From Swiss-Prot:
HAMAP family: Asp_carb_tr. It catalyses: carbamoyl phosphate + L-aspartate = N-carbamoyl-L-aspartate + phosphate + H(+). One of its GO terms (molecular function) is aspartate carbamoyltransferase activity. This is Aspartate carbamoyltransferase catalytic subunit. Heterododecamer (2C3:3R2) of six catalytic PyrB chains organized as two trimers (C3), and six regulatory PyrI chains organized as three dimers (R2). One of its GO terms (cellular component) is cytosol. Pfam families: OTCace (PF00185), OTCace_N (PF02729). It comes from the Bacteria.
Length: 324
């Protein structure tokens, strides 16, 4: 399934999942993002790399950060951008995903950025587009969110340098989190020293040990000596049945507080993919505190999404300069 992402020369054609991408390719994405990272501070916040290309954002789930940063990334690359409003589209009249796709293809689009509640939706679209069209997965069900993982890897690399000596803890709703799956694969591929997952048994997927992680049900034990803490949103909308007694009890056991964070290394950083539920996954004193790099993650999302857009379009990326 991962081979669909690469062309015959091993270059990115689609960006659907971290799985199947090697360390060299992930590092190239990070390095390419670095070349775009200063564009937002320039007087002219554009480079002409995708001028004349048309990118369609197909978001079948709600989004703030992901949609806005993909749109901004495309515009900073000088692409033409169309956001499909699913609530007012013909999908509300029963039109199938494939028929929607074919209609958009007839408009000669060059890339689809897709978010969908069904796992595998981005792969389905990638299998049905013409060879010149690229697909980027902006989140599919509980399966994958590769660009979020890569913006988090960029954030970690900027603060911590290399990965092999790091201890990283991922805390919370691992079971329903596409972010967690992508983070684990990215951290493992980049050679992270130790990956910990901290969660109640009811919020862990089966056979999670096979991903090479260390499991902790006691948050305090799991946070001891870690360099990076990634907290996850509690995804009530994806839960079936009673997975938790109450949000209050969840916060007592798995909410990140200053007291619990003190068990990590003194220079530890705190991350969250958003949206944040304050008082459930994390307290405000931590989310807004000196260890938090949550807003940096959002900023890095633009550079990462510029990088994967340029790379999947197979556009050579020179040193970033202002558009003329």
């Amino acid at each position: 399934m991962s081979n669909l992402q690469l062309d015959q020369n091993g270059q990115l054609r689609h960006f659907l999942s971290i799985q199947g991408l090697n360390r060299e390719l992930l590092t190239r994405i990070l390095d390419t993002a670095e070349s775009f990272s200063t564009i937002g501070a320039q007087h002219v916040k554009k480079v002409p790399l995708l001028r004349g290309k048309t990118i369609v954002n197909l978001f079948f789930e709600n989004s703030t950060r992901t949609l806005s940063t993909f749109e901004l990334a495309a515009k900073r690359l000088s692409a033409d951008v169309m956001n499909l409003n699913v609530r007012t589209s013909s999908t509300q009249k029963g039109e199938s995903l494939l028929d929607t796709l074919r209609s958009l293809e007839a408009m000669h689009c060059d890339m689809f950025v897709v978010r969908h509640s069904d796992s595998g939706a981005a792969y389905f679209i990638a299998r049905h587009v013409p060879s010149h069209v690229s697909v980027i997965n902006a989140g599919d069900g509980c399966h994958s969110h590769p660009s979020q993982a890569m913006l988090d890897m960029l954030t970690i690399r900027r603060h911590k340098g290399s990965f092999p000596n790091l201890r990283v803890a991922i805390v919370g709703d691992i079971l329903h989190s596409r972010v967690a799956r992508s983070e684990i694969h990215a951290l493992a591929t980049l050679g992270t020293g130790e990956i910990r997952v901290i969660a109640p048994r009811t919020l862990l997927p089966r056979n999670v040990e096979s991903l090479g992680v260390h499991i902790f049900h006691d948050m305090r034990a799991g946070l001891k000596g870690v360099d990076v803490v990634i907290t996850l949103r509690l995804q009530r909308e994806r839960m079936e049945g009673a997975r938790l007694p109450s949000e209050r009890e969840y916060f007592q056991l798995y909410g990140l507080t200053e007291e619990k964070l003190a068990l990590a290394r003194p220079e530890a950083i705190v991350m969250h993919p958003g949206p944040i539920n304050r008082g459930i996954e994390i307290e405000s004193a931590v989310a807004d505190g000196p260890h938090s790099v949550i807003l940096e993650q959002v900023s890095h999302g633009i550079a990462i999404r510029m990088a994967v857009m340029a790379m999947t379009m197979q556009i050579p990326v020179p040193e970033a300069k202002e558009a003329r």
